[in-house]
Amino acid sequence: MVKETTYYDVLGVKPNATQEELKKAYRKLALKYHPDKNPNEGEKFKQISQAYEVLADSKKRELYDKGGEQAIKEGGAGGGFGSPMDIFDMFFGGGGRMQRERRGKNVVHQLSVTLEDLYNGATRKLALQKNVICDKCEGRGGKKGAVECCPNCRGTGMQIRIHQIGPGMVQQIQSVCMECQGHGERISPKDRCKSCNGRKIVREKKILEVHIDKGMKDGQKITFHGEGDQEPGLEPGDIIIVLDQKDHAVFTRRGEDLFMCMDIQLVEALCGFQKPISTLDNRTIVITSHPGQIVKHGDIKCVLNEGMPIYRRPYEKGRLIIEFKVNFPENGFLSPDKLSLLEKLLPERKEVEETDEMDQVELVDFDPNQERRRHYNGEAYEDDEHHPRGGVQCQTS
């Protein structure tokens, strides 16, 4: 039992979520609310990052489950939170803040794919927007010699203010220079490049051809090195494509295996059957249960080499795992005469010798809501005992 569920609610998962479920939830939400895509959702992005940072760490998660957010803030497991952008970059392969300072930003894009795409392989063309160095000014932002050191911050890009917080006590506050927006240099408006307006970069449309190999998995990353955002003086970042698999109507993927449920009738469970299955590469395979091979409700069987292709070994495949659900006939489907005949064909049932000490009882259908109603009525009854309702008072003379 967890103390609170706030972090789980932020990620939209249950408290018993697996690490894979946490990763999938974070991936979708982080891409949706990233500041580059949603500039007004900075606080939401921060909450998502904090929730994932705690729940992805087994020690922090255990501490949170026992003591809630307060236990994390008190530092019982290395308290405090990392930068949301660092968490994002580490998750998507960006390398963290130090590497980000030497390179342009990575562009991360989620690509929706089907299970058929991952089974057969596919090629998709994807149009993206990215920053490129302005070719008109060659990334200077203006005319040659027009760029000058910002006199306000002396080229550091940062301002330092001293704030007195008490007698003999001062606080040093560092913030981005408003004059140069943190660049450490400025360009006179008349000398700015007309193409990029002094920003040194422009937005450009990029068409990528994304090759999805057989056996790739949900959440797998395809990286286009050096194709990300460009910035003057920095190496270009990467474009990272993250595969997001849609749910399939029939099959569920479990590693290299495919899992499915199959309904069969009672006669098929007892007497055998043949069932066709349409595969993800548009073949039809037929599974056979021979007469005399009893298939019980909940039995699990498999077909070898009919699962997912193994990544980079596409001629090898996992298993197709099938769980059988036996559908029983409705009450009264046989007349008494035929029922008697069926009984003679089936294995003999064990008769119970009744004694006088035994009580005869009757089976009825179970109603799961009945207990809830009884529980509710019981609470209401107890409440009446503790807080009697006021009735009409008899007048006494």
Swiss-Prot record:
Keyword Secreted: no
One term under GO cellular component: perinuclear region of cytoplasm
Keyword Repeat annotated: yes
Annotated Zn(2+) 1 binding sites: C134, C137, C193, C196
Feature: compositional bias, Acidic residues: 353-365
Gene Ontology biological-process entries: androgen receptor signaling pathway; flagellated sperm motility; negative regulation of apoptotic process; negative regulation of establishment of protein localization to mitochondrion; negative regulation of JUN kinase activity; negative regulation of nitrosative stress-induced intrinsic apoptotic signaling pathway; negative regulation of protein ubiquitination; positive regulation of apoptotic process
Positions of post-translational Phosphoserine modification: S83, S335
Positions where Cysteine methyl ester occurs in the chain: C394
Pfam families: DnaJ (PF00226), DnaJ_C (PF01556), DnaJ_CXXCXGXG (PF00684)
Entry-linked SMART domains: DnaJ (SM00271)
Region (Disordered): 352-397
Propeptide: 395-397
Zinc finger (CR-type) residue numbers: 121-205
Keyword annotations of the record: Acetylation, Chaperone, Cytoplasm, Endoplasmic reticulum, Lipoprotein, Membrane, Metal-binding, Methylation, Microsome, Mitochondrion, Nucleus, Phosphoprotein, Prenylation, Repeat, Zinc, Zinc-finger
Binding site for Zn(2+) 2: C150, C153, C177, C180
Main localisation: membrane
SUPFAM superfamilies in the record: Chaperone J-domain (SSF46565), DnaJ/Hsp40 cysteine-rich domain (SSF57938), HSP40/DnaJ peptide-binding domain (SSF49493)
PROSITE patterns recorded: DNAJ_1 (PS00636), DNAJ_2 (PS50076), ZF_CR (PS51188)
Domain J: 6-68
Modified residues (Phosphotyrosine): Y381
Lipid attachment site numbers (S-farnesyl cysteine): C394
HAMAP family, alphabetized: DnaJ (MF_01152)
Role: Functions as a co-chaperone for HSPA1B and negatively regulates the translocation of BAX from the cytosol to mitochondria in response to cellular stress, thereby protecting cells against apoptosis. Promotes apoptosis in response to cellular stress mediated by exposure to anisomycin or UV. Stimulates ATP hydrolysis, but not the folding of unfolded proteins mediated by HSPA1A (in vitro). Co-chaperone for HSPA8/Hsc70. Plays a role in protein transport into mitochondria via its role as co-chaperone.
Subunit-level organization: Identified in a complex with HSPA1B and BAX. Interacts with RNF207.
Protein name: DnaJ homolog subfamily A member 1
Species name: Rattus norvegicus
